[in-house]
């Protein structure tokens, strides 16, 4: 039995941008099951512009809690606010105990999620078999189905990948940022909030940039304010003759501007990051770098993505930093390997 008899759903969203984008596959499945259903979402404020590009969603409510904040009293007040919405089901996508309280206090009768931090009672429609759904997106999508019908990932029907709406960037804004879309633009997703073990060396990004520019293209270094030093170092490593064709917009765009810039570009090279999942959902060819992390858990959900992945004995460790302090998993993924994949993707 699927959820087609239900009409109103609430999503408790993941906090990480990449996880949030992957969760769109769940919303697409819910709309497939019942095109007339209403899907509301409770998510961090910074994600709201991206959520506006997901046509499956209706109401968007800000989750005010910072990462790691418990505050049971406020969670009770937040849940109580949702009672009058009379949701049929809530989907708790994060694994934390605290993320399950809002749906419980909202008195939503069907509360779905995986076990996570021993969330018995709070989640009354619980799956305990994460190991049977290796990919994070499979876990999200599985929640749309009855546990007795879809027991493992093999039972899942084929589902749609995330697809964010992209729009042409305003010409005035493009000019302010120094962008030129008349050329083939390569996006560099050189950041990753998780930590150094996801960061491909800046010297390697610089080599890729110089190669692309010598093919007649331009390169865009993009990211949040945290990525400003990284993009600046890439620029410093460029040869003088290629620097005029590199545009540094790190910290200068909001999420939707970044999405629209990606959507108007030719290709991308990204670390395993939220931007990687954004590029995938914008349906742009990309090469993805997996050092400490694994494509067996959170791969880019796109037929236009190719991954280069470490084969070090310690891979994947999923650690923020390298315990050996060598970062061999990243350093042994050479620029030439990435260039070959780009050529394969674009038939250069």
Where are these regions (language model features)?
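A short, glycine/small-residue-rich beta-strand->loop->alpha-helix junction that serves as a flexible
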Residues: 11-23, 50, 92, 194-201
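An aromatic- and histidine-rich active-site surface loop
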Residues: 27, 45-50, 91-106, 279
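Conserved nucleotide-sugar phosphate-binding/catalytic loop shared by glycosyltransferases and other
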Residues: 38-71, 130, 310, 314
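An amphipathic, basic-hydrophobic alpha-helix
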Residues: 67-87, 101, 105
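Nucleotide-sugar donor-binding patch of glycosyltransferase catalytic domains
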Residues: 113-118, 130-133, 233-236, 248-249, ...
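Mid-sequence helix-capping/hinge segment at a functional interface
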Residues: 114-197, 235
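Active-site donor-nucleotide binding/catalytic segment of nucleotide-sugar enzymes
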Residues: 168-230, 292-295, 338
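Donor-binding and catalytic core of enzymes assembling or modifying cell-surface/extracellular glycoconjugates
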Residues: 202-291
């Amino acid at each position: 039995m699927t959820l087609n008899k239900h009409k109103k759903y609430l999503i408790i969203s993941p906090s990480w941008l990449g996880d949030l984008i992957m969760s769109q596959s769940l919303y697409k499945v819910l709309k497939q099951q019942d095109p007339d259903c209403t899907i509301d979402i409770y998510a961090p404020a910074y994600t709201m512009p991206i959520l506006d590009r997901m046509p499956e969603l209706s109401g968007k409510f800000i989750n005010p809690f910072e990462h790691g904040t418990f505050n049971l009293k406020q969670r009770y007040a937040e849940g109580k606010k949702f009672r009058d919405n009379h949701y049929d089901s809530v989907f708790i996508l994060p694994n934390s105990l605290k993320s399950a309280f809002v749906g419980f206090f909202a008195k939503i009768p069907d509360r779905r999620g995986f076990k996570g931090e021993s969330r018995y009672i709070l989640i009354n429609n619980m799956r305990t078999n994460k190991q049977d759904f290796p990919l994070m997106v499979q876990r999200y999508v599985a929640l749309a189905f009855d546990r007795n019908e879809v027991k493992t990932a093999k039972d899942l029907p084929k589902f749609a990948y995330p697809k964010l709406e992209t729009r042409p960037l305003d010409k005035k804004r493009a000019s302010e940022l120094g962008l030129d879309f008349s050329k083939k633009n390569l996006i560099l997703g050189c950041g990753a909030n998780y930590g150094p073990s996801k960061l491909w060396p800046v010297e390697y990004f610089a080599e890729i940039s110089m190669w692309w520019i010598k093919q007649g293209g331009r390169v865009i270094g993009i990211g949040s304010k945290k990525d400003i030093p990284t993009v600046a170092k890439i620029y410093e490593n460029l040869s003088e003759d290629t620097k005029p064709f590199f545009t540094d917009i790190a910290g200068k765009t909001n999420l939707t501007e970044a999405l629209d810039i990606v959507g108007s570009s030719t290709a991308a090279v990204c670390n395993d990051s939220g931007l990687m999942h954004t590029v995938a959902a914008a349906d742009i060819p990309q090469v993805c770098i997996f050092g400490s992390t694994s494509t067996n858990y959170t791969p880019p959900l796109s037929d236009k993505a190719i991954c280069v992945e470490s084969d070090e004995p310690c891979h994947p460790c999923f650690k923020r930093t390298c315990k050996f302090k060598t970062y061999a998993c990243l350093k042994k993924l050479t620029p030439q390997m990435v260039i070959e994949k780009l050529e394969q993707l674009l038939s250069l």
